[in-house]
Every structure is written in C-alpha cells, then in structure tokens.
C-alpha cells in the first residue's frame, strides 16, 4: 500500500539577487529547504533570509 500523502511538503528557497548580482562576496547561489502547509499557503513563498554569497539579508523565493 502506498503511504498517505501529507499536507506539508518540502520546498526549496533560492536567493533572487544571486542570479543578477555580479559584486558578490563569493560565487554561487544560496538555497534553503523548508516545509510549508499546502492548504494554508497555496502560492509561492517569499521569505527574507540571510544569503552568505551576497553577505546580506535578501528575498528568497520558492523554486520547483
């Protein structure tokens, strides 16, 4: 039998400024993983988190 699919899903958040910013501290893109409730948050998440590559707090958006 298949396991029942839960309400919470694991998502990946990616820095929006790492793609376009050329004056970064180090090369690369910052990514975080977290979970969200599928029923309460139907749209894409946007959270302000610390990016070690940009060395500042930036907006991280949900990616596929």
Swiss-Prot record:
Q: Which GO terms describe its biological process?
A: translation
| Alphabetical keyword list | Ribonucleoprotein, Ribosomal protein
Q: Name one GO molecular function term.
A: structural constituent of ribosome
Disulfide bond: present as a keyword of the record?
A: no
* Keyword set includes Ligase: no
A GO cellular component annotation here is:
cytoplasm
| Pfam families, per the entry | Ribosomal_L33 (PF00471)
The domain of life for this entry's organism is: Bacteria
Give the UniProt family note: Belongs to the bacterial ribosomal protein bL33 family.
Protein name per Swiss-Prot or TrEMBL? Large ribosomal subunit protein bL33
């Amino acid at each position: 039998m298949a396991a029942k699919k839960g309400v919470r899903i694991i998502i990946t958040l990616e820095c929006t400024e790492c793609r376009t910013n050329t004056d970064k501290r180090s090369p690369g893109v910052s990514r975080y993983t977290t979970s969200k409730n599928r029923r309460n948050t139907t749209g894409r998440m946007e959270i302000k988190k610390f990016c070690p590559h940009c060395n500042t707090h930036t907006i991280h958006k949900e990616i596929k």
